């Protein structure tokens, strides 16, 4: 065992004070650390201010900042004062002499230990709770602004007859104040009790009285305040019943009072309020009675009442009054919920029409002509053909198209054309060498719009481009083609300085440019450069010679994040889409105002409701929600973002929305009136997809208007899974120009199908007029199918396509030669009482792996066709040819080459392709297989010959990449060599349609 004696254990080491030099060094390091942290915080604040000022929305920054600071200091100070005063008061009320007991003797050591630091300890505790409370309060800036600026809805709830604004704007703020009050009371009570215990005012094990009179009175007042706040909570809970959600009839977010709420919970809350008030008064009376006997009894009775009256009694009412006769008891409350929910989601005007689902028309020619007149069927699926755009129009590896393209309308010769559109955006992953200069100075922007007809493809299965090539040319005339702001521009760029930017490349080589716009933040100031160097953790910004006079930094460059930043009170639609408006590329962003405080309106979860097979594979299409659970939504704002200047403009769209009016009061001047929207922009506005997805989900239950049907659950629908893939995710809605049975002409519409809950047959077809500027824009039409007849739904139709023997054999052949078959959007069109289904079939051929339109599947009235073109398929299905003038299919001849070897191979490929088409018509599968092999051999020879020619000429020339280099309509999908491997254009710089820098 070690020696525990008192002998010497070795020399003692005395630790003296550090030398002056060490103290100076430590102090210097400490000061530098503090200054460094201060500058980091300053850099974040300063760069935010500079950005908001650059986009001319500085009022948004100052309003939100001042509100946050005000809430932080007010509530932080209130909490600090509440806790500090009670600690001080408990110390002031301490007994002059503590009892002589072991407990008090133990506490003496602590009292003596903290005596020299009492003031600092008090300051530290109050500062800590104040900081926490202030930070929590500052996060409620939206709640505060809505309460201060709230405008009435001019609609009253059916139970308490209060304006909806009370629930949407007032009640959330009152609940925050109540929560803050509870926190202050509890913290003060704990702090006071600990202080009383430390200084002898409270005793746990000592003999005699457990508390002094002063401690008893002090703690009784705090307990009385707590119970009084509980009384206020009971009173507010009465109104909270109108916005309370519950699981009712498999509707997890059913909102509003039910029978048990109105007849059990509501009177129970009133009774508990009265009991809590009496109990609070008993605690306050302790100041005079100096005993806790009555208040403790009262508090116990309050807890017992909460269990019996607030819990057991409603359960008894539900069990013995409601459940035996549920429909009769709940019907009046369900009617209130139906009405409020339909109003809150804007579906109260939905028109439901009975639709037979089967045509009685026997005139085949009429049916065939009606098919052309009813819809302009979009064969080009924007969610499939992005790789085709990429292959044919990428031009350079540092350009890319989005995963999902967009659908818009453009007029030509006075007629609207559904158009699939995408922007050739910057792709930093494709630049020759990644370094700081290349990533942020040289490669700064995309270039040009690429657009194609949505209703047709050329004879080779490729898109019929209406705008293409680099620089772009086509139907859109002159416009600013440079894209500095887009969905793929997620990194910052520094432009306008001495470093030139890569503009585009053509046959004559690379073109350079320098940004002439006014957006971005000027980096001429050393302070600005230092702030951004810290904010972006890029020290090069501070000292790089590539930054000079006129240099500007562009960031926050995606359309959605720019709109979200300038309007942080808006929920942003997941799909921003581009349009050429007034010679500029404008990103159009739909934005919503929401609340979850609309009485009796059932809630929905935006993230779940707007999810489908597209968002599952592309999270950039997910909605940007300010609050995920809502029970009121309006598409109140249409926003635009200029792709060149980055300018953000907010336009009022729903002029009656009280939530928008509230935010306009809070941020005056940020939203322009609806009348300021130019006609050229209105032509491209459309009904937003995310709002439509929310509405269709609600309409699966709320298409019924009577309570009995709702309660029976006999007409519950569901959104079907996407039949074109096996992901199990919901089918997305589709845009196409069509007319419903009660419409006289085609309109740009957003459509979807609905099936019975748990089954695959069709229940309803739903569409909304998506064409802004028309009289019935936003009108929802629902065609309800009869329950007495089974009408095939999308999944069943897809299954029929896959199981029909002739089609299955053709699909098997299309998959030959290392090709992949991909189904496009399965479109549904109501036609003469029946339903026409159309699905394009794409083939990704060989090693090129980009889809080309090969076949069209059509079914109507039990007849199915699988043909090369839509017209052929419709003719076969209806057994009659159209008597109307067919649209221009944009057929192009196979391209030629100046290289004799390549041209010879292309001629052989064309012959093989023609032979294969003839073999398919017979059908002669053996001959088709031989022609397929000959075609692949010929294309391989053409590709090899072209590669040799490019190598011999230094790779500076290539064919027109918009057309390819071979007859790419082979059923295997084999195609020309990749345009991206030889991306130069056949146009001179003079073909640049850009009107110049603006």
Curated annotation (Swiss-Prot):
Pfam families, A to Z: UPF0182 (PF03699)
One GO cellular component, as annotated: extracellular region
Domain of life per record: Bacteria
Feature: compositional bias, Polar residues: 893-902
Bias (Low complexity): 966-998
Keywords: Cell membrane, Membrane, Transmembrane, Transmembrane helix
Chain ranges passing through the membrane: 25-47, 69-91, 120-137, 176-198, 219-236, 266-288, 295-317
Composition skew (Basic and acidic residues), residue ranges: 939-951
Region: Disordered, residue numbers: 879-902, 939-998
Subcellular location: Cell membrane
Chief subcellular location: membrane
Topological type in the membrane: Multi-pass membrane protein
Membership in a protein family: Belongs to the UPF0182 family.
Listed name of the protein: UPF0182 protein SAV_3055
UniProt lineage: Bacteria, Bacillati, Actinomycetota, Actinomycetes, Kitasatosporales
């Amino acid at each position: 065992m070690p020696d525990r004696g008192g002998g010497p254990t070795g020399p003692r080491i005395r630790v003296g004070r550090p030398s002056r030099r060490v103290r100076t060094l430590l102090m210097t390091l400490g000061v530098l650390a503090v200054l460094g942290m201060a500058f980091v915080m300053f850099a974040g604040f300063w760069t935010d201010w500079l950005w908001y000022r650059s986009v001319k929305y500085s009022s948004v920054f100052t309003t939100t900042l001042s509100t946050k600071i005000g809430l932080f200091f007010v509530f932080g100070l209130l909490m600090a004062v509440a806790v500090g005063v009670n600690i001080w008061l408990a110390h002031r009320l301490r007994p002059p002499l503590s009892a002589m007991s072991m407990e008090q003797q133990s506490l003496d050591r602590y009292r003596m230990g903290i005596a020299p630091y009492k003031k600092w300890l008090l300051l530290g505790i109050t500062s800590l709770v104040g900081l926490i409370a202030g930070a929590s309060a500052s996060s409620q800036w939206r709640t505060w602004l809505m309460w201060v600026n709230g405008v009435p809805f001019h609609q009253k709830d059916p139970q308490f007859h209060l304006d909806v604004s009370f629930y949407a704007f007032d009640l959330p703020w009152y609940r925050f104040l109540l929560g803050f009050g509870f926190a202050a009371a509890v913290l003060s009570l704990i702090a006071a009790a600990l202080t009383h215990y430390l200084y002898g005012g409270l005793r746990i094990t000592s003999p005699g009285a457990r508390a002094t009179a002063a401690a008893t009175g002090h703690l009784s007042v705090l307990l009385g305040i707590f119970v009084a706040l509980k009384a206020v909570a009971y009173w507010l809970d009465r109104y909270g019943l109108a916005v309370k959600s519950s699981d009712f009839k498999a509707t997890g977010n059913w909102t509003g009072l039910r029978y048990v709420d109105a007849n059990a919970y509501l009177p129970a809350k009133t009774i508990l309020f009265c009991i809590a008030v009496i109990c609070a008064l008993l605690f306050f009376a302790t100041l005079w009675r100096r005993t806790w006997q009555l208040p403790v009894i009262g508090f116990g009775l309050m807890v017992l009442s909460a269990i019996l009256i607030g819990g057991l009694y409603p359960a008894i009412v539900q069990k013995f009054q409601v459940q035996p006769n549920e429909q009769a008891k709940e019907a009046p409350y369900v009617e209130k919920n139906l009405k409020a929910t339909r109003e809150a989601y804007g579906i109260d005007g939905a028109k439901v029409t009975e639709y037979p689902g089967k045509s009685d028309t026997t005139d085949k020619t009429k049916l065939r002509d009606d098919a052309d007149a009813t819809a302009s069927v979009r064969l080009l699926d924007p969610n499939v053909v992005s790789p085709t755009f990429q292959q044919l129009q990428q031009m350079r590896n540092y350009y890319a198209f989005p995963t999902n393209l967009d659908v818009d309308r453009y007029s030509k010769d006075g007629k609207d054309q559904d158009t699939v559109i995408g922007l050739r955006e910057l792709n930093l992953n494709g630049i020759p060498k990644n370094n700081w200069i290349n990533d942020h100075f040289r490669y700064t922007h995309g270039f040009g719009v690429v657009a194609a007809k949505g209703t047709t493809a050329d004879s080779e299965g490729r898109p019929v481009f209406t705008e293409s090539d680099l620089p772009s040319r086509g139907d859109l005339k002159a416009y600013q083609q440079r894209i500095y702001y887009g969905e793929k521009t997620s990194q910052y760029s520094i432009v306008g300085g001495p470093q030139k930017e890569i503009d585009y490349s053509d046959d004559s080589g690379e073109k350079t440019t320098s940004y002439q716009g006014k957006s971005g933040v000027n980096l001429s100031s050393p302070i600005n450069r230092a702030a951004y160097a810290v904010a972006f953790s890029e020290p090069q910004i501070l000292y790089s010679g590539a930054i000079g006079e006129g240099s500007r930094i562009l960031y926050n460059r995606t359309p959605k994040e720019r709109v979200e930043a300038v309007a942080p009170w808006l929920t942003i639609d997941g799909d921003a889409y581009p349009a050429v408006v007034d010679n500029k590329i404008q990103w159009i962003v739909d934005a919503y105002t929401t609340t979850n405080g609309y009485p009796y309106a059932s809630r929905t979860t935006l993230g779940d409701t707007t999810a489908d097979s597209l968002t599952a594979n592309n999270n950039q299409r997910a909605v940007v929600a300010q609050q995920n659970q809502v029970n009121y939504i309006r598409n109140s704002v249409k926003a635009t973002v200029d792709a060149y200047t980055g300018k953000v403009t907010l336009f009022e769209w729903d002029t009656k929305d009280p939530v928008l009016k509230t935010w306009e009061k809070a941020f005056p001047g940020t939203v322009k009136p609806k009348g300021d929207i130019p006609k050229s922009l209105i032509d491209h506005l459309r009904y937003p997809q995310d709002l439509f997805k929310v509405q269709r989900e609600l309409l699966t239950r709320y298409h019924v208007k009577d309570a009995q049907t709702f309660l029976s659950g006999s007409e519950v629908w569901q959104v079907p899974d996407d039949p074109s893939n096996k992901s199990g995710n919901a089918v997305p809605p589709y845009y196409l120009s069509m007319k419903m049975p009660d419409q006289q002409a085609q309109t740009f519409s957003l459509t979807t199908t609905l099936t019975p809950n748990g089954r695959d047959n069709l229940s309803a077809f739903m569409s909304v007029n998506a064409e802004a500027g028309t009289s019935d824009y936003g009108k929802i039409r629902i065609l309800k199918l009869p329950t007495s007849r089974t009408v095939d739904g999308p999944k069943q139709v897809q299954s029929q396509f896959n199981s029909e023997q002739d089609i299955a054999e053709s699909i098997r052949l299309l998959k030959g030669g290392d090709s992949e078959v991909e189904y496009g959007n399965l479109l549904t069109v109501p036609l003469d009482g029946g339903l026409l289904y159309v699905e394009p079939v794409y083939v990704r051929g060989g090693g090129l792996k980009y889809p080309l339109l090969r076949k069209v599947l059509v079914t109507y009235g039990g007849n199915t066709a699988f043909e090369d073109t839509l017209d052929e398929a419709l003719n076969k299905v209806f057994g009659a040819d159209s008597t109307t003038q067919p649209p221009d299919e944009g057929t192009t001849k196979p391209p030629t080459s100046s290289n004799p070897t390549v041209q010879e191979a292309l001629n052989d490929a064309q012959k093989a392709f023609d032979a294969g088409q003839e073999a398919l018509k017979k059908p002669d599968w053996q001959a088709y297989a031989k022609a397929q092999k000959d075609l692949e051999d010929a294309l391989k020879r053409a590709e090899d010959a072209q590669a040799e020619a490019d190598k011999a000429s230094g790779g500076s020339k290539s064919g027109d990449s918009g057309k390819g280099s071979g007859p790419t309509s082979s059923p295997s999908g084999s195609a020309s060599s990749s345009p991206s491997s030889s991306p130069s254009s056949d146009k001179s710089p003079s073909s640049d349609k850009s009107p110049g820098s603006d």
